Amino acid sequence: MESSLYKKTSGKARRALRVRKALKGSSLKPRLSVVKTNKHIYVQLIDDVEGKTLASISTLAKISKTSGLTKKNQDNAKALGVKIAELGKSLQVDRIVFDRGAHKYHGVVAMVADGAREGGLQF
Protein backbone atom coordinates (compact mmCIF):
# COMPACT_ATOMS: atom_id res chain seq x y z
CA MET A 1 0.00 0.00 0.00
CA GLU A 2 1.31 3.45 -0.92
CA SER A 3 1.89 5.99 1.78
CA SER A 4 0.22 9.38 1.59
CA LEU A 5 3.61 11.11 1.48
CA TYR A 6 4.64 9.01 -1.52
CA LYS A 7 1.40 9.87 -3.33
CA LYS A 8 1.90 13.55 -2.62
CA THR A 9 5.51 13.71 -3.85
CA SER A 10 4.93 11.55 -6.91
CA GLY A 11 1.87 13.60 -7.84
CA LYS A 12 3.87 16.80 -7.55
CA ALA A 13 6.62 15.35 -9.75
CA ARG A 14 4.05 14.29 -12.37
CA ARG A 15 2.49 17.76 -12.40
CA ALA A 16 5.90 19.40 -12.83
CA LEU A 17 6.79 17.08 -15.73
CA ARG A 18 3.44 17.74 -17.38
CA VAL A 19 4.13 21.48 -17.29
CA ARG A 20 7.80 21.26 -18.29
CA LYS A 21 7.42 18.89 -21.23
CA ALA A 22 5.91 21.72 -23.28
CA LEU A 23 8.54 24.29 -22.26
CA LYS A 24 12.00 24.63 -23.74
CA GLY A 25 14.29 27.52 -22.93
CA SER A 26 17.21 28.77 -25.02
CA SER A 27 19.86 31.44 -24.52
CA LEU A 28 17.69 33.96 -26.40
CA LYS A 29 14.47 32.95 -24.64
CA PRO A 30 15.36 31.21 -21.36
CA ARG A 31 12.98 29.45 -19.00
CA LEU A 32 12.03 31.35 -15.83
CA SER A 33 11.65 28.64 -13.21
CA VAL A 34 9.90 29.36 -9.90
CA VAL A 35 10.32 26.98 -6.97
CA LYS A 36 8.73 27.62 -3.62
CA THR A 37 9.23 25.84 -0.34
CA ASN A 38 7.59 26.35 3.03
CA LYS A 39 9.96 29.23 3.87
CA HIS A 40 11.64 30.46 0.69
CA ILE A 41 11.25 31.28 -3.01
CA TYR A 42 13.84 30.41 -5.68
CA VAL A 43 13.79 31.96 -9.17
CA GLN A 44 16.14 30.96 -12.02
CA LEU A 45 16.69 31.82 -15.67
CA ILE A 46 17.65 28.52 -17.34
CA ASP A 47 19.06 27.79 -20.80
CA ASP A 48 17.82 24.25 -21.53
CA VAL A 49 19.91 23.86 -24.69
CA GLU A 50 23.19 24.31 -22.81
CA GLY A 51 21.83 22.97 -19.53
CA LYS A 52 23.02 26.04 -17.63
CA THR A 53 21.52 28.47 -15.19
CA LEU A 54 22.00 32.00 -16.54
CA ALA A 55 20.87 33.88 -13.44
CA SER A 56 19.25 33.06 -10.14
CA ILE A 57 17.93 34.80 -7.06
CA SER A 58 16.14 33.63 -3.96
CA THR A 59 15.06 34.82 -0.56
CA LEU A 60 18.28 33.21 0.74
CA ALA A 61 20.65 35.22 -1.50
CA LYS A 62 22.88 37.94 -0.02
CA ILE A 63 21.31 40.59 -2.25
CA SER A 64 17.89 39.60 -0.89
CA LYS A 65 19.05 39.74 2.72
CA THR A 66 20.45 43.26 2.31
CA SER A 67 17.16 44.33 0.70
CA GLY A 68 15.08 42.75 3.46
CA LEU A 69 13.51 40.13 1.16
CA THR A 70 13.94 37.15 3.45
CA LYS A 71 10.40 35.82 3.90
CA LYS A 72 8.05 34.06 1.52
CA ASN A 73 5.22 36.48 0.91
CA GLN A 74 3.64 38.16 -2.10
CA ASP A 75 5.45 41.49 -1.69
CA ASN A 76 8.84 39.82 -1.61
CA ALA A 77 7.86 37.57 -4.52
CA LYS A 78 7.08 40.60 -6.65
CA ALA A 79 10.40 42.21 -5.69
CA LEU A 80 12.23 38.99 -6.63
CA GLY A 81 10.49 39.09 -10.02
CA VAL A 82 11.71 42.64 -10.60
CA LYS A 83 15.26 41.68 -9.55
CA ILE A 84 15.38 38.64 -11.84
CA ALA A 85 14.18 40.91 -14.67
CA GLU A 86 17.10 43.26 -13.94
CA LEU A 87 19.51 40.30 -14.01
CA GLY A 88 17.95 39.16 -17.29
CA LYS A 89 18.27 42.62 -18.81
CA SER A 90 21.97 42.64 -17.92
CA LEU A 91 22.27 39.40 -19.95
CA GLN A 92 20.36 40.96 -22.91
CA VAL A 93 17.31 38.78 -22.24
CA ASP A 94 13.93 40.39 -22.85
CA ARG A 95 11.72 37.37 -23.65
CA ILE A 96 11.24 34.33 -21.42
CA VAL A 97 9.20 31.14 -21.06
CA PHE A 98 7.50 30.97 -17.65
CA ASP A 99 7.76 27.66 -15.76
CA ARG A 100 5.48 27.47 -12.74
CA GLY A 101 6.53 23.91 -11.96
CA ALA A 102 3.98 21.88 -10.01
CA HIS A 103 2.39 24.99 -8.48
CA LYS A 104 -0.78 26.77 -9.53
CA TYR A 105 -0.43 30.17 -11.17
CA HIS A 106 -1.70 31.83 -8.02
CA GLY A 107 -0.37 33.81 -5.08
CA VAL A 108 3.41 33.86 -4.78
CA VAL A 109 4.00 32.30 -8.22
CA ALA A 110 1.74 34.85 -9.92
CA MET A 111 3.44 37.71 -8.08
CA VAL A 112 6.89 36.60 -9.31
CA ALA A 113 5.49 36.66 -12.85
CA ASP A 114 3.94 40.11 -12.32
CA GLY A 115 7.21 41.46 -10.95
CA ALA A 116 9.13 40.06 -13.92
CA ARG A 117 6.65 41.71 -16.29
CA GLU A 118 7.03 45.02 -14.45
CA GLY A 119 10.80 44.65 -14.76
CA GLY A 120 10.46 44.46 -18.54
CA LEU A 121 10.47 40.75 -19.36
CA GLN A 122 7.96 39.53 -21.93
CA PHE A 123 6.29 36.12 -21.68
UniProtKB/Swiss-Prot annotation:
A GO biological process held by the record: translation
Entry keywords, A to Z: Ribonucleoprotein, Ribosomal protein, RNA-binding, rRNA-binding
Pfam families in UniProt: Ribosomal_L18p
Ribonucleoprotein keyword on record: yes
Spans traversing the lipid bilayer: none
Gene Ontology cellular-component annotations: cytosolic large ribosomal subunit
A Gene Ontology molecular function term of the record: 5S rRNA binding
Keyword Ribonucleoprotein: yes
Top-level taxon: Bacteria
Subunit annotation: Part of the 50S ribosomal subunit; part of the 5S rRNA/L5/L18/L25 subcomplex. Contacts the 5S and 23S rRNAs.
Family affiliation: Belongs to the universal ribosomal protein uL18 family.
Function of the protein: This is one of the proteins that bind and probably mediate the attachment of the 5S RNA into the large ribosomal subunit, where it forms part of the central protuberance.
Protein name per Swiss-Prot or TrEMBL: Large ribosomal subunit protein uL18
